[in-house]
Amino acid sequence: MLTLQRTDDTYIVYRDDRCIGSLRLYDNPHHMRNCYVKLELDEPDTGISAELFKELRKIAERPLQVMVDSDKAELIAFLLSGGFVCRRKCYEVEVGIEDYIGGQADAQLEHCRIGEADYEKACRMLFAHYAETHKAVNPWTADYGTFCDALPEDVIYSKQGAEIVSVAFVEENEIAYVCGVDKNSFAEFARSLVCTMLEKYETICFESDDCDWAAMLLKSLFKNQEETSYDTYVYDNEAAISR
């Protein structure tokens, strides 16, 4: 028999009156649809996973979310056996010129900074892109201003006529966020961006979420990458809340 004993936001987990660990439920104020779960179980036994997550879903009254490194095989097996689904893989990439396989490009790059008109356009473009590509994982629920507050102050971008078609928010050698209106124009932009940055920096770094086509296209321009990732698992069994 599985029982949970609550202390504030922490739950002690008992199986047949024996403590097998604890877990914590918490919120991310920027992504409020899902309830985040931090598991600290001594024995992630797949025999109790379905019962445990069904009970947590009742308590939270919304989908559950767990973040885990992709090399944590035992924990991942526990999540999958209980009904979680992997919704996102996030790859951390750090590369140099020797890793680049994208070839030459001649997209015309422009630069703007916070406070300029094109910077505001780039912010709105990125916000729409982020909201669309991440809504199936855990939608952004904070306001637009909060989103912009976390962005770097420098943008590299390209235009077709008067329209901005590709954007990269950058900070020194880090490409923090990218987006574009279509894959073809963004691919040309990304190659030019990378070649330009690698002329200035020995390495560049960025994160690529597999739910974000632009970030994954950027990742595809390089070889010799580490394939471990930081993964997002979601449990969204609404039937679990019925009694």
Q: Which sequence ranges carry the predicted segments?
A:
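A mid-sequence, solvent-exposed acidic-amphipathic segment
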Residues: 132-171
